[in-house]
Swiss-Prot record:
Entry keyword set: Lyase
Name of the protein described by the UniProt record: Cyanate hydratase
Taxonomy, superkingdom: Eukaryota
Active site residues according to the UniProt entry: 92, 95, 118
Principal EC category: lyase
Keyword hit for Lyase: yes
Function according to Swiss-Prot or TrEMBL: Catalyzes the reaction of cyanate with bicarbonate to produce ammonia and carbon dioxide.
Coiled coil: none
EC nos: 4.2.1.104
Transmembrane region(s): none
Length: 166
């Protein structure tokens, strides 16, 4: 597990590489074929860099050092500072999900059945669009695999020895 101080130091170095490049998360995403949110997750040590993505990320952020790449390829300790929920943009995102959550859940149930949206097999992006009134709008897309709840039949429980009935 990464100590929070070590993680913060690595994140600072990764964000410096982004700053030096002069590129946005969306710009780096366009060059790497990743989503802009995933690029941000990589640079914040919330996602693991995969080997096949290294060349594209190095090209997009040429000041990334070998040791940073090596660290990025290790499974991260996915966490956040508890005070982050008080940051206004994050607070409003949380508020929106909580406010619309019950309705979203009911629509998922109607459209798919009893289940949830995965946050593991998941894609997320943030886009800027012009609204009907000509003002900027934020589009946050959550694209997660549907996972149905399963009926828990003991015969499907592989950790149990096979029972023989007489």
């Amino acid at each position: 597990m990464e100590a929070s101080g070590e993680k913060a130091a690595v994140v600072r170095r990764l964000m410096e590489a982004k700053e030096v490049s002069g590129k946005t998360f969306s710009g780096i995403a366009a060059e790497t074929g990743l989503t802009n949110v995933y690029v941000a997750q990589l640079l914040r040590r919330q996602a693991q860099l995969k080997a096949d993505t290294v060349p594209a990320l190095r090209a997009a952020l040429p000041t990334l050092t070998d040791d940073l790449i090596e660290l990025m390829m290790q499974p991260p300790f996915r966490s956040y500072h508890p005070n982050i929920v008080h940051e206004p943009a994050i607070y409003r995102l949380n508020e929106a999900v909580m406010h619309f959550g019950e309705s979203i859940k009911e629509i998922i149930n109607e459209e798919f059945g009893d289940g949830i949206m995965s946050a593991i097999d998941f894609y997320c992006s943030v886009d800027k669009v012009e609204g009907a009134d000509g003002k900027d709008r934020v589009v946050v897309t959550f694209d997660g695999k549907y996972l149905p709840y399963t009926e828990q039949k003991s015969e499907h429980m592989m950790s149990r020895p096979t029972r023989k009935t007489s």
